[in-house]
Amino acid sequence: MVCEKCEKKLGRVITPDTWKDGARNTTESGGRKLNENKALTSKKARFDPYGKNKFSTCRICKSSVHQPGSHYCQGCAYKKGICAMCGKKVLDTKNYKQTSV
């Protein structure tokens, strides 16, 4: 669960946008280069499990969180009805029987 404010912070999918004016994958905006070797230019974006950008742990159950920038895992966020990134209350779970099975 993610609130509307934190939804903007979520990562984007790598697939290119459909062509339109102002798309982020056109060469005019500097987004996508022609004839570029992806193996040489993607070293910064590669996943490094032991590097600086490690995933954090959940503040409730201490398991690893698989979403960068989140403080709570999806199971705990669903049970408590909070945003996984900021912890803001998203859903009133008073009359619900929440399980994460």
From Swiss-Prot:
Localization, UniProt: Cytoplasm; Synapse; Cell projection, Dendritic spine
Region spans: PDZ3-binding: 98-101
Nucleotidyltransferase recorded as keyword: no
Chain segments annotated as coiled-coil in the UniProt record: none
GO molecular function annotations of the record: microtubule binding; PDZ domain binding; protein-containing complex binding; scaffold protein binding
InterPro entries membership: PDZ-binding_CRIPT
Keywords assigned by UniProt, alphabetized: Cell projection, Cytoplasm, mRNA processing, mRNA splicing, Spliceosome, Synapse
Region (Disordered): 19-38
Effect recorded for residue 100 to D: Abolishes interaction with DLG4. Strongly abolishes interaction with DLG4
Transmembrane spans: none
A GO biological-process term: RNA splicing
Cellular compartments per GO CC: cytoplasm; dendrite; dendritic shaft; dendritic spine; glutamatergic synapse; neuronal cell body; postsynaptic density, intracellular component; spliceosomal complex
Pfam families: Cript
Region annotated Sufficient for interaction with DLG4, chain positions: 95-101
Tissue: Expressed in striatum, cortex, midbrain, Purkinje cells of the cerebellum, pyramidal neurons of the hippocampus and neuropil. Expressed in heart, brain, lung, liver, kidney and testis.
PANTHER family given in the database record: CYSTEINE-RICH PDZ-BINDING PROTEIN
Function text: As a component of the minor spliceosome, involved in the splicing of U12-type introns in pre-mRNAs. Involved in the cytoskeletal anchoring of DLG4 in excitatory synapses.
Similarity annotation: Belongs to the CRIPT family.
Quaternary organization: Component of the minor spliceosome. Within this complex, interacts with RNF113A, as well as with SF3B1/SF3b155, SF3B2/SF3b145 and PHF5A/SF3b14b. Interacts with DLG4 and TUBB1. Interacts strongly with the PDZ3 domain of members of the DLG4 family. Associates with microtubules.
Protein's recorded name: Cysteine-rich PDZ-binding protein
Gene source species: Rattus norvegicus (Rat)
